[in-house]
UniProtKB/Swiss-Prot annotation:
Gene name, Swiss-Prot/TrEMBL: recR
Name of the protein in question: Recombination protein RecR
InterPro entries found in the cross-reference section: DNA_Rcmb_RecR, Rcmb_RecR, Rcmb_RecR_Znf, TOPRIM_dom, TOPRIM_RecR
Metal-binding as UniProt keyword: yes
Organismal lineage: Bacteria, Bacillati, Bacillota, Bacilli, Lactobacillales
Zinc finger (C4-type): 57-72
Family to which this protein belongs: Belongs to the RecR family.
Annotated source species: Lactobacillus gasseri (strain ATCC 33323 / DSM 20243 / BCRC 14619 / CIP 102991 / JCM 1131 / KCTC 3163 / NCIMB 11718 / NCTC 13722 / AM63)
Length: 199
């Protein structure tokens, strides 16, 4: 038996989310169908607002409602360091840790030639332009996930940045190989930042 078209479409849409297979998508679709109408409307409005009201900061690439973002506008941030991360969720992880007070730069991905992702497909050009314009920057912290693609991206960036005379560091060991920063606890992140090493 086939599901009615509205349920089938909802299942298909849930399956577009990462880590959601057909069984989970089906459960979510039927749960959504049983939700009070007000909750469903609020949920759908939230989805639309995320797409309409959030965009990338023109300076760092983080998600924001205003441009530049709150972090880039904050005069109390340490402007001598820029931490380069893969995704906006990594910024959130470091901010929740509460130990880092510098600036960020979000790449929105990592180099992955097998997937057709080269330097032009991620936010590298704006990082280099930013480093050329902001004289107060002394250190670039490469806080990329410890996947093979993250490591390759870190090495690529280090080769681009070092000739400018800036200190380039990498997070210390402590993050398991292949692990994502967003899943690390705050103690692990704190130790990784404090024990960062030169590249």
């Amino acid at each position: 038996m086939q599901y009615p078209l509205p349920i089938a479409r909802l299942i298909d849409n849930y399956m577009k989310l990462p880590g959601i297979g057909e069984k989970t998508a089906t459960r979510l679709a039927f749960y959504t169908m049983d939700m009070p109408e007000d909750d469903v409307e609020d949920f759908s409005k939230s989805l639309i607002q995320v797409k309409e009201n959030l965009h990338s900061c023109s300076i760092c690439g983080n998600i924001t409602e205003s441009d530049p973002c709150e972090i880039c506008r904050d005069a109390n941030r340490d402007r001598s360091t820029i931490m380069v991360v893969e995704q906006p969720k990594d910024v959130m992880a470091f901010e929740e840790m509460g130990e880092y007070n510098g600036l960020y730069h979000v790449l929105h991905g990592v180099l992955s030639p097998m997937d057709g992702v080269g330097p032009e497909e991620i936010n590298i050009k704006s990082l280099i332009t930013r480093l050329q314009k902001q004289d107060e920057v002394k250190e670039v912290i490469l806080a990329l996930n410890s996947s093979p693609e993250g490591e390759a991206t870190a090495m690529y960036l280090a080769k681009l940045i070092k000739p400018a005379g800036l200190k380039v560091t990498r997070l210390a060991a402590g993050l398991a190989v292949g692990s994502d920063i967003e899943y690390a606890n705050s103690i692990t992140l704190k130790r990784a930042v404090q024990g960062r090493t030169d590249l």
